[in-house]
């Protein structure tokens, strides 16, 4: 889970 998601 990317930080920008």
From Swiss-Prot:
Its main location: secreted. The modification Methionine amide is found at residue 5. GO terms for biological process: defense response. Keywords: Amidation, Amphibian defense peptide, Secreted. It is found in: Secreted. GO terms for cellular component: extracellular region. Expressed by the skin glands. This is Tryptophyllin-T2-4.
């Amino acid at each position: 889970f990317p930080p920008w998601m």
